[in-house]
Design a protein with these regions (language model features):
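N-terminal secretory signal peptides that target proteins for export/translocation
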Residues: 1-10
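Post-HEXXH active-site segment of zinc metalloproteases
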Residues: 113-124, 140-173
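Active-site recognition of the HExxH zinc-binding catalytic motif
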Residues: 128-140
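Bacterial N-terminal signal peptides
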Residues: 13-26
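Sec/Tat signal peptide C-region and signal peptidase I cleavage site
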Residues: 27-31
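Metalloprotease/metallohydrolase-associated module, dominated by Zn2+-dependent proteases
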Residues: 34-113, 157-209
């Protein structure tokens, strides 16, 4: 008989630090070149158990809160260095926009000593969890690249104090943020539905050794 239990849900929780902030920080030569790379941080939380079902129950007790109890989640911190340049004709141009992005992954860490068959089952499970969360990370990175592409060269006429161009940018940031969040929700729904990749991972762990 299959052993099942209530399943904590995977949830994507986008924690944003300074996402809409327009930071007027002097730009270095590296920043002006447009080259940048995201940083990555991996957090784990300890769980206990000597079988798949015990490990999963521990996840339910200790997992991160991301709106609901979660198995894992992906968050990020994003700030910007931007340079707005008033033009001689009264317009304003956003000349440079450099992101500082950190993608933060959180997932469970099993005990170091597990029975061999349980350890093998766990490794398959956690590898699938990481694969799932890294797709969310790619969604975040894609959003930031879209923001960067939209930002650089953005121009507003009759804007000597660079207020109009900021307002236009803020509206687009909101649209791209909403798009990314919906993309994450859609992906979770696909993966967690009956027969989905994450659903299968959970069942294999719970019903395994």
């Amino acid at each position: 008989m299959n052993r099942t239990s209530p399943l904590p849900a995977f949830r994507f929780n986008a924690a944003v630090a300074g996402f809409l902030a327009a930071l007027l920080i002097p730009l270095t030569a590296e920043a002006q070149s447009g080259s940048w790379k995201p940083s990555e941080q991996i957090k784990t939380y300890a769980i206990s158990g000597n079988s798949g079902i015990e490990l999963y129950r521990s996840i339910g007790e200790r997992g991160p809160q991301a709106g609901v109890q979660a198995v894992a989640h992906t968050t990020f911190k994003l700030t910007w260095r931007r340079e707005y340049r008033p033009q001689a004709d009264g317009a304003c141009v956003l000349a440079t926009a450099r992101p500082n992005l950190t993608i933060i992954y959180t997932w469970p860490k099993a005990p170091g000593k597990l029975p061999p068959d349980v350890a093998a089952s766990w490794q398959r499970f956690i590898a699938g969890v990481e694969k799932h969360e890294r797709v969310h990370g790619e969604h975040i990175l894609d959003m930031v690249r879209k923001i960067e592409a939209y930002s650089v060269g953005l121009r507003a006429e009759d804007d000597p104090k660079c207020q109009k161009v900021r307002a236009v940018l803020q509206q687009r940031l909101k649209e791209l943020s909403d798009e990314q969040r919906q993309r994450g929700r859609d992906f979770d729904r696909q993966e967690l539905t009956d027969g989905g990749a994450v659903h299968q991972l959970i069942l294999a762990l719970v019903n395994g050794p």
